[in-house]
């Protein structure tokens, strides 16, 4: 069965309670449930992992080779700091989509640079948690080549 890996970086486990004026009240569990339901409508699955630890995310990216067809990732603060995460994504050769809940370009200047964006198949910012649905749908249709089952 085709599979998408959905990764979330540091502090995203706090979705729903962390700065709801920025991130909304949708929880990470809600995001993952919707992503899995969407993938199922394409005959695919979504595997989810959230970690506050860079090495855990990197290890899971390495494990995705041969198992997943694409990666959807919200790297959180690692967006702006992690060359290692970039290298892991490039090293496994899987297409990936970068997601950010807020418009990072409208926030503090240190959030404007991403180590991933120039290599991502797509970058989705500022759509709130709906951005995950856009990313999963795009990955399934355009990176994996599936059509939604009617």
UniProtKB/Swiss-Prot annotation:
EC number of this enzyme: 4.2.1.10
Lyase keyword on record: yes
Active site as annotated: 23, 100
Gene3D superfamilies in the cross-refs: Dehydroquinase, class II (3.40.50.9100)
GO BP: 3,4-dihydroxybenzoate biosynthetic process; quinate catabolic process
Listed Pfam families: DHquinase_II (PF01220)
Ranges in coiled-coil conformation: none
Catalytic activity entry: 3-dehydroquinate = 3-dehydroshikimate + H2O
Enzyme kind, highest EC tier: lyase
Residues at which substrate binds: 74, 80, 87, 101-102, 111
Record-linked SUPFAM superfamilies: Type II 3-dehydroquinate dehydratase
Pathway per the UniProt entry: Aromatic compound metabolism; 3,4-dihydroxybenzoate biosynthesis; 3,4-dihydroxybenzoate from 3-dehydroquinate: step 1/2
Site (Transition state stabilizer): residue numbering on this chain: 18
GO molecular function, one term: 3-dehydroquinate dehydratase activity
Record-annotated disulphide pairs: none
Keyword terms: Lyase, Quinate metabolism
Family: Belongs to the type-II 3-dehydroquinase family.
HAMAP family attached to this UniProt entry: AroQ (MF_00169)
Subunit and partners: Homododecamer. Adopts a ring-like structure, composed of an arrangement of two hexameric rings stacked on top of one another.
NCBIfam families documented for this protein: aroQ, PRK05395.1-1, PRK05395.1-2, PRK05395.1-3, PRK05395.1-4
Function in brief: Is involved in the catabolism of quinate. Allows the utilization of quinate as carbon source via the beta-ketoadipate pathway.
The protein, known as: Catabolic 3-dehydroquinase 2
Native species: Aspergillus flavus (strain ATCC 200026 / FGSC A1120 / IAM 13836 / NRRL 3357 / JCM 12722 / SRRC 167)
Gene: qutE2
């Amino acid at each position: 069965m085709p599979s998408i890996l959905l990764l979330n970086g540091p502090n995203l486990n706090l979705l729903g309670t962390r700065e709801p004026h920025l991130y909304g009240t949708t929880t990470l569990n809600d995001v993952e449930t919707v992503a899995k339901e969407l993938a199922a409508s394409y005959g695919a699955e979504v595997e989810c992992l959230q970690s506050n630890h860079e090495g855990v995310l990197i290890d899971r990216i390495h494990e995705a080779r041969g198992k997943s067809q694409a990666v959807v990732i919200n790297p959180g603060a690692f967006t702006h700091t992690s060359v290692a995460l970039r290298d892991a994504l490039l090293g496994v050769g899987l297409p990936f989509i970068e997601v950010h809940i807020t418009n990072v370009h409208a926030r503090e200047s240190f959030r404007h640079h991403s180590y991933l964006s120039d290599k991502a198949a797509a970058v989705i910012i500022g759509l709130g948690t709906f951005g995950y649905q856009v990313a999963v749908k795009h990955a399934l249709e355009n990176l994996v080549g599936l059509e939604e089952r009617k």
